[in-house]
């Protein structure tokens, strides 16, 4: 295990072991190799002391070089900095409980169900994108800033347990949205949102537009 230092602060622990890897992209992987590499990241820091994942610029969207396949654990926060690029998390056994913060103009893509572990919050800064990529994820609070967006493809499912706030146009796609708890406040219309929405008994959704939840059915 090695300490991960960031600006002089111990923000995470990294575990290494032998593992099977591939190279290239998801569509054009070049076979399997046995390598000694990163297998686990334990998040420690929160807020300004959170671990920041940076994207390598200029690579294809599905490049494995911008994918974190190691298991992510711990109670710290995770920040994604990928201006104009995409970072993905692809380990379905992730269990981290801290917040997930996608910084301005960055995209975070799920490569597996539950890739965000048991994150207590997903916070999308201006023009940031969370791409569920046909996967399912449960989160605590959801915050979607101006011009940011949660992109839910056909078989995607997002469960929000603790409400939150969504700006106009912040929801897109035709998967499933489950509001399980808290109050989700949606400001403005989401004309590109065609998902089925389920509002559980302990939850509420507040909208100020007839298209706040798009144009599909709403169940309660």
Language model features: what each stretch is:
Residues 76-77, 82:
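FAD-dependent flavoprotein oxygenase/oxidase catalytic domain
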Residues 40, 44-45, 65-75, 86-158, ...:
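Surface-exposed loop/turn positions within long extracellular repeat scaffolds
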Residues 5-8, 12, 21, 81, ...:
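Small/flexible residues
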Residues 1-69, 153, 157-162, 174-183:
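Extracellular/surface-exposed low-complexity segments
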């Amino acid at each position: 295990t090695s300490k991960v230092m960031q600006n002089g602060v111990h923000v995470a622990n990294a575990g290494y072991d032998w593992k099977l890897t591939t190279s290239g992209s998801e569509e054009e992987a070049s076979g399997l190799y046995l390598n000694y590499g990163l297998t686990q990241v334990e998040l420690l820091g929160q807020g300004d002391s959170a671990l920041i994942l940076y994207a390598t610029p200029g690579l294809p969207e599905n490049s494995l070089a911008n994918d974190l396949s190691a298991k992510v654990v711990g109670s710290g926060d995770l920040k994604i900095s990928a201006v104009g690029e995409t970072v993905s998390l692809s380990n379905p056994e992730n269990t981290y409980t801290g917040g997930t913060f996608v910084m301005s103009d960055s995209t975070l893509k799920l490569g597996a169900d539950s890739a965000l572990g048991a994150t207590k919050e997903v916070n999308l800064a201006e023009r940031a994108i969370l791409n569920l990529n046909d996967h399912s994820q449960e989160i605590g609070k959801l915050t979607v800033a101006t011009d940011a967006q949660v992109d839910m493809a056909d078989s995607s499912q997002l469960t929000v347990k603790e409400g939150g706030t969504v700006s106009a146009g912040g929801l897109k796609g035709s998967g499933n949205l489950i509001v399980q708890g808290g109050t989700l406040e949606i400001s403005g219309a989401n004309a590109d949102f065609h998902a089925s929405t389920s509002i559980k008994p302990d939850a509420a959704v507040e909208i100020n537009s007839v298209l706040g939840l798009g144009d599909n059915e709403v169940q309660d």
